[in-house]
Amino acid sequence: MVHTTSPLLLLLLLSLALVAPSLSARKCSLTGKWTNNLGSIMTIRAVNSRGEFAGTYLTAVADNPGNIKLSPLLGIQHKRACQPTFGFTVHWNFSESTSVFVGQCFIDRSGKEVLKTKWLQRLAVDDISDDWKATRVGYNNFTRQRTVEE
């Protein structure tokens, strides 16, 4: 007995066999230069074997924009996942505040890397009675800045 297979089914199976490995093999990488939805620029240097990384953050927004300075960041990510979760802290060099970000590195449907983050910013206050207003919460979405060669 001979079975015939439709050409459409063969084409579909061949397409899946060729496309599926490339989708799963692509890994989202934190290393590089990123811009968020507000225009801030973040640079993450190489992630080490333990998932630790360092970099810089230049915010585009601040209570006193004239004082903005490049600020250091330190973080860690999970290394095994293709779309890893991560967290980092920014020590602001121009104000008495610290921010922590948590997020995940995604590859969107068009193949672009996107960092989806939530953050807390702790401001210094002079009195414990002002504690209620010392923590801000927000989100940022970062996209990779492409180099000239890309």
Swiss-Prot record:
Its main location: secreted. It is found in: Secreted. Glycans are attached at residues 93, 141. Keywords: Biotin, Disulfide bond, Glycoprotein, Secreted, Signal. Pfam families: Avidin. This is Avidin-related protein 3. Biotin binds at residues 36, 40, 57, 59, 63, 95, 99, 140. GO terms for cellular component: extracellular region. Disulfide bonds join 28-105. The lineage of its organism: Eukaryota, Metazoa, Chordata, Craniata, Vertebrata. Residues 1-24 form the signal peptide. InterPro entries: Avidin, Avidin-like_CS, Avidin-like_sf, Avidin/str, Avidin/Streptavidin-rel. It comes from the Eukaryota. Residues 26-147 form the Avidin-like domain. Forms a strong non-covalent specific complex with biotin. Homotetramer. Glycosylated. The keyword Calcium does not apply. Belongs to the avidin/streptavidin family. GO terms for molecular function: biotin binding. PANTHER family: AVID PROTEIN-RELATED, AVIDIN-RELATED.
